[in-house]
Amino acid sequence: MAEIKYKVKKEEEGLRLDQLLSKMNEVPSRSSAQRWVKDKHVQINKTIVESPSRKLKWGDILEVMIPPPKSLDLRPEKGNLEILYEDNDLIVFVKPAGLVVHPSAGHEAGTLVNILLEHCHDLSGIGGATRPGIVHRLDKDTSGIMVSAKNDKTHQHLAKQFKDHSVRRSYQALVWGILKNKKGSINAPLGRHPVNRKQIAVVPNGRRAVTHWEVEHCYSNTSLLTCRLETGRTHQIRVHLSSQGFPIVGDPLYGKSSHHLLKFMNEPAKSALKNFKRQALHACDLGFFHPGREEEMDFSHPAPKDYKNLLEMMELEDSVKNGHGSPKDLER
């Protein structure tokens, strides 16, 4: 079992234990750090600690026993994945909307991980027993490009890139409303909602979160944006845009407040928006450094059919409103 020894620096005094651990290259993520602490793999000054929130002092000596990858007890399942690239180290693919990334309570099977295990037969186990190969996630109802690691070395390299925010990620988002500016940035810390624990919110002492956005097209009552992530927090784009008054169309958690705009639209367009049962968010671009090939790689993929159909309906609605078509065009 590999070991990390580390002496807390003066400028690191007051940090949470899991916060400092997650900055180390050997630790895949903050959730991994928390799991290692709770599993009694971490000592401070020769004493085992079990609280990830333990505040550190200048001069504390940390000793971390890196646990070996857990054996995988998951059932491979057949499924259709559009693969953009694959080699012995990693696989790049398109996750469809509606697919949960990894098993959890209530989703023990039928996940992306189960499908990857069937296709790849072997994945990096460093992310934990239920998250083999997973170095980043997309929400269940968000579609788009993902990368998974096939071995531990690649997993560590990719995880560090995500941690250092050097991975290039862009998303296409259809939002309610017309933005006044053509582009901008949202720098607002995120954390758990103080009341609804299923939601994320902008909170004063949350984790740093930065989203850059640019308007691609404005329709009658909606706008199509390209959003680039500088950080990658849970629900980041969804919460940031909603906090600015432009929630994503179809978002069940953060987008309900803008349905009043439907009354200004023709019935077919109104119906299309009402019946779009997921957030209109698609991970369209992904770029990273391939550790095995030692080169930068970039991938792009257009939005899926349901998203394209919605955008076509918005274009027709726009055309009718501008006098370039008739309401009957929307019914075709």
Where are these regions (language model features)?
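RNA pseudouridine synthases
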Residues: 2-332
